[in-house]
Regions:
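Membrane-embedded beta-barrel scaffold of Gram-negative outer-membrane proteins
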Residues: 241, 374-378, 382-384, 485, ...
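Short, acidic, small-residue-rich periplasmic hinge/interaction motif at the N-terminus
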Residues: 29, 33, 41-43, 72-76, ...
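Short acidic/polar hinge/loop motifs at secondary-structure boundaries
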Residues: 59-61, 181-210
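Short, acidic Ser/Thr/Gly-rich low-complexity loop/linker segments typical of extracellular
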Residues: 47-57
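Extracytoplasmic beta-strand/coil segments of soluble accessory domains associated
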Residues: 61, 125, 142-181, 185
Length: 755
C-alpha cells in the first residue's frame, strides 16, 4: 500500500512541476522553398531550448518568465524576439527563416559532405556564384575557373596550386563533381568542361589540396564540385542569346582568313519551378563556333532536367539527366611561327563526333532518429567517334554511393560514412582494339566535432580497392584538420591530407598516333601517392554593407611516383619514328607555396560591387633532381614542367544605376620548363624540330602574359539586359599551353531576359 501511495505522490508532484512550466512548440521552414529546416536551433535566454527534428518541428518546456527567443540555422539570418511565458501556457511558434546571402555566411557542402559555413572549414575552399557565370557569358566551366586564385587550366587540364602540369588529355589529379557525383571520363579521367550545364548552376565549390580521404583516387590535388540549381517558391525562366566575332591577331601575318571572320553564336534556356511536392529544373544550350584556328569548328547542343519529389518530410527521390551531342575538330600544335601560329600542323587536326549522357537517380531519407541515408547513382556514357576508327572511343561508367550521416546535437558532432562502387567498360581501338574494364570500391568515414563553440576538428579516412585488366591494388588514406574561430569573423585553420591516384586505362594502355608522333602504352605504370598540408587564416571584413573574406595561406604538397605524360624519344617501341608521348613515373616531387586572396560582395554606398582577387606563388621541384629528369626538361634547373610560378587573378564588377561594368585581369609568369623534345632539334646541331618554332617563340615571349577582359551591360529593366563582352581586350598574342595560341580579341553581344 505504501508503494502505491508513493507512486501516486510522485505522479502528482510531476504534474505539479509540469504545470509550473510553459510549453513552447512549433515549426521552422525555409522562407523561399517552404521546406522544413532540420537541425535549426530554438533557444531561450535561460538556456532552455531544442533543435528541430526531421519534419522541422520542435517542442520543449521552460519556466515562466520574460525571455529572449532566438532561432538560428547555418546559412540563414538569425531571428530574435522577446517572449513572455506564463505557468501552464502552450505557445506555438511557426517561423520562416530567410537565407543569408552575405559572403561572410556562405554555406558549402564539399569539404565535409554536410552544410557548413565557409569560414569554419578546415581546408581552403573558394566559391563561384551563379552571377559571375551569367554575367561573363562563359560557355565552358574552365573559362570561369581561370578567374579563381590558385587555379589554372592548361588545354582542358585543371591544376590547383601547381599540383599537376599538362597531361595531354589523360589522368586528372583534380576531381570534377556535379552534384557530388564524379563526371570524369571512365577511360582517361578527363573533365569535359563543355558538358557542365552552365545555364543551371547554383554555385561551384573548389577545394584546394588532397581530398582523397572523402572523394577517392582522382582527388589527389583537390576537387571542383558543381552544385546545380533547384527552384524556389517563385518560378524562374531565363533566356540568353549571344553572337561574337574574333578580331585579327596583333601580328597580322598570322591572320589566315579574309573577310569571313571567325565567330561564335549560341543560346541557352533555363526554367525552375515548384509544383507542390515536385521540383523541376530544366535547361538547354546550343553553341556554334567557327574557330580562329584554321579549319577548326565546334558545334554542340545540350539539354538537362533535374527533378525532386518529396514523398513526405522524411523521404525525397529524384532523377537528373544531362545529355549532349557535339561535332568538332581539335587543334594539337601549330605549323610554324612565321604565319602558321593559328594553322594546325599537317596531319594533327582531329575530327570528333560525340554523345555524352549522365543519368542520376537518387534517394534521400531521414529516419525516425534524424539520421540521413542517401543513395546516389550515376550512369555516364561517353561515346566519341573520329574520322579514323583507330581513335574512336566508347566508354561507360556506372557509379553508386551510399551515405550515412548522424548529428550528435548534445556533443556538437557529426559522423559521416559511406561506401562507393564504380565500374567502367571501354571498347576502343584507341587501346589496342581491346575491351578493358576497371573497378573501384571504397569505404570512408569522417568525424567532425566542435569544441567550446569555436574549435572545429575534422578527421577522416578512406580505404580504396582498385582493379584494371587483372591488376588489383588497395590502399588507405587519411586526413586531419582544425579550424579555430579567434573572433567573430576570424578563422585560423590547419590541415593535412593524404592523396592517392590509380592509373587510368588511357595512361597504361593507350596506343595511337598523331601525325608522325606516337602515343605509347606503359603497362608497368604504378600508382602515385602523396600528401598536402596547409596553414591559413581567413579574416572577414565589412565596409558599409560590403562584405569580404581576406585569406592568407601557406601550403606544401609532396608526391611519390608522380605520373606524367612525357614527350620524348622511345626507341624500344619498335616504330619507324619513335618520338611521342608516354605516361611515366617521374619520381618524387615537392611543391611549396603561398597564396593571398580577397573575395567580396555587397554595396559601397549605393553601388553593388563584387571582387575576386588573388596572388599565388609556387616552387615546384623534384625531391631528387637527377640527370634523367634534367634531360627530359627544357630547363637546366630543378623545376617541374608546365607550371607558372607566379599567377595573379583579378575580377571586379560594379553596377551604377542601369550600367553594370566588369573587368578581369589574369597574369601568368613565364612557363620555365616544358618537355625537352619539344624544343630540342631531332638531330643535334640542326634546325629540324618536331614542333617548328617553339624554342624561338619561347625565347621571344619569356616575360609572362597579362590578359585583360572587359564587360559592360545595360540593364533595360528588371527582366531585360544587353551586354558587350570583350575578351583579350588588348589583343595580346599569347600561349598558355606550348605550341597552341590562345584566342585573339573577341567581342560578343548578348541579350538576356529573365521572366
Amino acid at each position: 500500500m505504501k508503494r502505491y501511495l508513493l507512486l501516486l505522490v510522485f505522479a502528482l508532484l510531476c504534474q505539479l512541476i509540469q504545470a509550473q512550466n510553459a510549453v513552447i512548440t512549433g515549426l521552422i521552414t525555409d522562407a523561399d522553398t517552404q521546406e522544413p529546416l532540420i537541425g535549426a536551433t530554438v533557444f531561450l535566454s535561460n538556456q532552455t531550448g531544442a533543435a528541430t527534428g526531421i519534419d522541422g518541428t520542435f517542442e520543449f518546456e521552460s519556466p515562466a518568465g520574460t525571455f529572449t527567443l532566438t532561432i538560428s540555422y547555418v546559412g540563414y539570418l538569425k531571428q530574435s524576439r522577446e517572449i513572455i511565458l506564463t505557468v501552464g501556457q502552450v505557445v506555438e511558434i511557426n517561423n520562416t527563416l530567410e537565407q543569408d546571402n552575405g559572403i561572410l555566411n556562405t554555406v558549402v557542402v564539399s569539404g565535409s559532405k554536410f552544410e557548413k559555413k565557409l569560414g569554419e572549414e578546415t581546408v581552403s575552399i573558394d566559391v563561384i556564384k551563379q552571377t559571375l557565370i551569367n554575367n561573363t557569358n562563359d560557355v565552358k566551366l574552365d573559362q570561369t575557373l581561370q578567374r579563381m586564385p590558385g587555379v589554372c587550366v592548361i588545354d582542358g587540364q585543371a591544376n590547383i596550386r601547381g599540383g599537376s602540369g599538362y597531361s595531354f588529355g589523360a589522368g586528372s589529379r583534380v576531381l570534377l563533381l556535379m552534384d557530388d557525383l564524379p563526371v570524369l571520363t571512365g577511360d582517361a579521367a578527363f573533365p569535359s568542361w563543355d558538358f557542365i550545364p552552365m545555364e543551371n548552376i547554383e554555385q561551384v565549390e573548389i577545394i584546394k589540396g588532397a581530398s582523397s580521404a572523402l572523394y577517392g583516387s582522382s582527388a589527389l590535388n583537390g576537387i571542383i564540385n558543381v552544385r546545380t540549381a533547384y527552384p524556389t517558391s517563385t518560378p524562374e525562366t531565363r533566356f540568353n542569346f549571344f553572337n561574337g566575332m574574333y578580331f585579327s591577331p596583333r601580328d597580322t601575318a598570322q591572320k589566315w582568313w579574309d573577310d569571313d571572320f571567325p565567330f561564335t553564336a549560341g543560346a541557352s534556356f533555363a526554367h525552375r519551378q515548384k509544383f507542390g511536392r515536385f521540383d523541376l529544373s530544366t535547361g538547354a544550350y546550343v553553341y556554334n563556333q567557327n574557330s580562329y584556328f584554321k579549319d577548326m569548328y565546334n558545334r554542340r547542343g545540350r539539354a538537362n532536367i533535374n527533378t525532386r519529389y518529396r514523398i513526405n518530410n522524411n523521404l525525397a527521390v529524384g532523377l537528373n539527366v544531362n545529355a549532349q551531342v557535339n561535332r568538332s575538330t581539335s587543334f594539337f600544335f601549330w605549323s610554324g611561327i612565321d604565319s602558321g601560329l593559328y594553322i594546325p600542323f599537317d596531319g594533327t587536326a582531329a575530327f570528333n563526333q560525340g554523345f555524352k549522357i549522365t543519368v542520376d537517380p537518387y534517394f534521400n531519407y531521414y529516419d525516425k532518429k534524424g539520421n540521413r541515408h542517401k543513395l546516389l547513382m550515376r550512369y555516364y556514357g561517353n561515346h566519341n567517334a573520329t574520322a579514323t576508327t583507330a581513335q574512336s572511343n566508347f566508354n561507360d561508367l556506372y557509379y553508386g554511393e551510399y551515405q550515412y550521416q548522424k548529428h550528435f546535437e548534445n556533443i556538437a558532432a557529426v559522423l559521416s560514412a559511406g561506401v562507393v562502387g564504380s565500374f567502367t567498360k571501354v571498347v576502343a581501338e584507341l587501346y589496342g582494339d581491346t575491351t578493358f574494364t576497371s573497378g573501384n570500391e571504397a569505404a570512408y568515414l569522417q568525424f567532425d566535432k566542435k569544441f567550446f563553440d569555436k574549435l572545429n576538428i575534422s578527421s577522416g579516412m578512406r580505404y580504396e580497392f582498385n582493379q584494371i585488366a587483372g591488376l588489383k591494388e588497395s590502399r588507405p588514406v587519411f586526413r586531419l584538420g582544425a579550424n579555430y574561430q579567434a573572433a567573430e569573423y576570424t578563422y585560423i585553420r590547419a590541415s593535412w591530407g593524404q592523396g592517392y591516384r590509380f592509373p587510368t586505362i588511357a595512361e597504361k594502355y593507350i596506343s595511337t598516333s598523331i601525325s608522325l608522333l606516337g602515343v605509347f602504352p606503359n603497362p608497368d605504370l604504378t600508382s602515385e601517392t602523396g600528401w598536402s598540408s596547409e596553414i591559413g587564416i581567413k579574416q572577414g571584413m565589412k565596409i558599409s554593407s560590403w562584405q569580404a573574406f581576406i585569406d592568407l595561406s601557406g601550403f606544401i604538397s609532396e608526391y611519390n611516383n608522380m605520373m606524367e605524360f612525357t614527350f620524348g624519344y622511345y626507341p624500344d617501341e619498335g616504330v619507324f619514328f619513335p618520338y611521342g608521348f608516354k605516361s611515366l613515373n617521374i619520381g618524387a616531387t615537392r611543391i611549396l607555396g603561398g597564396e593571398i586572396s580577397v573575395i567580396g560582395e555587397g554595396k559601397f554606398g549605393t553601388i553593388p560591387t563584387t571582387l575576386i582577387a588573388g596572388y599565388t606563388y609556387i616552387d615546384p621541384k623534384f625531391q631528387d633532381f637527377d640527370s634523367l629528369q634534367n634531360a627530359l626538361s627544357s630547363a637546366d634547373e630543378n623545376i617541374l614542367k608546365y607550371r607558372f610560378k607566379h599567377t595573379i587573378k583579378f575580377d571586379a564588377e560594379s553596377t551604377i544605376k542601369k550600367l553594370r561594368i566588369g573587368v578581369t585581369v589574369n597574369y601568368y609568369s613565364f612557363m620555365e620548363a616544358v618537355d625537352a623534345a619539344f624544343v630540342d632539334p631531332i638531330i643535334p646541331n640542326t634546325t629540324i624540330y618536331i614542333v617548328p618554332g617553339l624554342q624561338q617563340y619561347r625565347d621571344e615571349h619569356n616575360t609572362g602574359d597579362c590578359i585583360v577582359d572587359m564587360r559592360v551591360a545595360f540593364l533595360v529593366n528588371k527582366t531585360n539586359e544587353i551586354s558587350l563582352i570583350c575578351t583579350n581586350l588588348l589583343n595580346r598574342d599569347y600561349s598558355i599551353r606550348p605550341a597552341m595560341m590562345e584566342a585573339p580579341r573577341n567581342l560578343t553581344v548578348r541579350y538576356a531576359v529573365k521572366l
